[in-house]
Amino acid sequence: MAAKLLVTGGFPNQAPNEVIDLKNENNHCNNIGDDLSGKFKYGTVGGLLNDQPVICGGAYIDTNQCYTVKDQGTLLSGTLHENRMFSASAVINDSLWITGGFDGSSLSKATEMFHLALGKSTPGPELPYPVYHHCVAKINDFQAMMIGGFYNLNPPYLYDFQQEAWTVLPSLMEPRGMAGCATFEEQGQVKVIVSGGTMNGQVFSSTEILDVQSGTWRQGPELPQTLYKHSMVTQNNQVYVIGGETKQGYQSTIYRMECSELLECHWQELTQKIQTPRCQFTAMLVPDELAKCEQN
């Protein structure tokens, strides 16, 4: 079971890996893998493949390479077809679906599926438009949603891997890039939440929640502060916002969305924090056996 939070890379460039126990504030966890700054810096993507954390792309070194984070170090696990930074990804059918991004000269609308067992990727479905600094939310085992990004006002799209087709969805209430997104269930229905982000120089504290079945957006709970370049994860149907950047600089805070039976939600700041404040990093949940934690 994926129960611990792994944070890798990001600004500042020398930020080490960190493992955080989201459920027990008294636990201190040993970090896994070595410092990623010598391999890539920020703007990476990643996911858990075969219970192993995999990180791909990023600026500006080895932007087409993928690494597996292990106890003994961060090991090269394969390559991508394209250089990619500021992409977005989701784990689909035990492969990492990597979408869009920037190759150093232009935006991409190509996608690829990285297969850990093969150590390489295969072409994925082409995006409706080139984009970076966007977000991808996994809806289920065969559907994922692409949201926001620069530099356009395009609506979100849902891709169905079984039907091999894109479906356009209703536009966000506020267009945004560098936002975070995650999924959760509410009364048995899948929801997508989008938080923070920026557009035209404005940084947002607002959140929006999509009812996937009805295709309607509603306002979500306001973040405690304006925030962008952060990450979001969902553990046991609880949504977390991690790190990011504000006008005051890089953030170490972790917020959890808490909702009443009346579906009134707010953000609760956790005692746990990132030891090195950072933004534009990759965060994912990893199995307990990968992270050794003990009481402080």
Feature roles, as predicted:
Residues M1-N296:
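Kelch-like beta-propeller repeat domains
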